[in-house]
From Swiss-Prot:
Organism, as annotated: Streptomyces avermitilis (strain ATCC 31267 / DSM 46492 / JCM 5070 / NBRC 14893 / NCIMB 12804 / NRRL 8165 / MA-4680)
Gene Ontology cellular-component annotations: cytoplasm; endopeptidase Clp complex
Alphabetized SUPFAM superfamilies for the sequence: ClpP/crotonase
EC numbers on record: 3.4.21.92
Gene3D superfamilies per record: 2-enoyl-CoA Hydratase, Chain A, domain 1 (3.90.226.10)
Chain's gene name: clpP4
Protein name per Swiss-Prot or TrEMBL: ATP-dependent Clp protease proteolytic subunit 4
Keywords: Cytoplasm, Hydrolase, Protease, Serine protease
Function of the protein: Cleaves peptides in various proteins in a process that requires ATP hydrolysis. Has a chymotrypsin-like activity. Plays a major role in the degradation of misfolded proteins.
């Protein structure tokens, strides 16, 4: 069963469901900080959010997309002139969830700094590339994967199959346009590359124009990385 039509994603067990809160997947350490207002208890995600960092470390589905969009809009309302950082380690996911986050990133006023840690695959690769030009980064051993949307729709009335096929073609065209807009690679080359999985090292992603720099330590780039 395909849970996300047109995305190539399949059903997962509850234990694997990445849209669930982090606390339901594993134990997150909490720490206490003394402030002028008293004692505050944090988890790492809350602390990162306070520092204007959004960590996208899950599959991109409707639940995680809503979380990211809410954080983007909240951080914009708190200070529309300060950058927002999005750290990415994601296997990708739903195309509609991707476009929801993508449009919100383009909509908000703050610059969006994107950093790939681990992997930015499929939909996550688009989000990595969609950061503000000059502020898109990857760690040295990160990898980026791009490919075309796909679907396993194989049954139903002919008219339904035709509708599904046309939607896949529309999504592919939209994906190609996004990659062309946010990279230095010609769209003709992109069309050829996404016929199959295209795996890029950090160096390859830099050459492709999906990122602007490779960073290995904060010491070299304190002003750029939140």
């Amino acid at each position: 069963m395909n849970d996300y039509p047109g995305s190539g994603l399949h059903a997962r067990t509850q234990a694997e469901y990445t849209g669930a809160r982090a606390e339901s997947r594993y134990v997150i350490p909490r720490f206490v900080e003394r402030t002028s207002q008293g004692v505050r208890e944090y988890d790492p995600y809350a602390k990162l959010f306070e520092e204007r960092v959004i960590f996208l470390g899950v599959q991109i589905d409707d639940a995680s997309a809503n979380d990211v969009m809410a954080q983007l809009l909240c951080l914009e309302s708190m200070d529309p002139d300060r950058d927002i950082s999005v750290y990415i380690n994601s296997p990708g996911g739903s195309f509609t969830a991707l476009t929801a986050i993508y449009d919100t990133m383009q909509f908000v006023k703050p610059d969006i700094q994107t950093v790939c840690m681990g992997q930015a695959a499929s939909a996550a690769a688009i989000l990595l590339a969609a950061g503000t030009p000059g502020k898109r980064m990857a760690l040295p051993n990160a990898r980026v994967l791009i490919h075309q949307p796909y679907s396993e729709t194989g049954r139903g009335q002919v008219s339904d199959l035709e509708i599904a096929a046309n939607e896949i073609l529309r999504m592919r065209s939209q994906l190609e346009d996004m990659l062309a807009k946010h990279s230095t690679t010609p769209i003709e080359k992109i069309r050829e590359d996404i016929e199959r999985d295209k795996i890029l090292t950090a160096e390859d992603a830099l050459a492709y124009g999906l990122i602007d720099q490779i960073i290995s330590t904060r010491k070299m780039n304190n002003s750029a990385v939140a």
